Amino acid sequence: MRLMRTPLIATAVAIAIATTLTGVAVAARVLNVRDEGHLRFVTSDGSELIDEGPATGTVPGKVRVHFVYDGEPAVSARFTIYGHGGSISGKAKGRLSNPTSPDPSFRGAFQITGGSGSYIHIHGTGELFGVFDRRGSNKYGLVVQTIGKLPY
């Protein structure tokens, strides 16, 4: 009986190791994001400003941001980055450092809400930094930096 158990135990161990190694082989990749966008004003709808521009860094491409500013220190945004391998969408919340300044800086967090192409399974969170530039009536701009680790 003892001899019969040894092959069964060895088989069970081999299956466990194979299953573990298979899990490692298909583990998610992680995108260490460090991107920057210099965006220009496109249009507005009430307190929502829509800006677009180039993004450089880990996921270079074009960025479109729906930035919500209502005069309060709290700001929010929805964004999509259109890169070569697909798109990444998310949302963000932050606080302006000095809301009365013509170019207040802000800091907050972003959360990925979806992706396409190579980024279809992307998710995660990160930090957001930037400057909201108010250059006059309907002349707004954003400089935004993001840092995060995003599994995909």
How would you describe each model-predicted region?
Residues 1-11:
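Bacterial N-terminal signal peptides that target proteins for export
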Residues 11-20:
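Bacterial N-terminal signal peptides
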Residues 26-152:
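Beta-strand-enriched cores of mature, soluble protein domains
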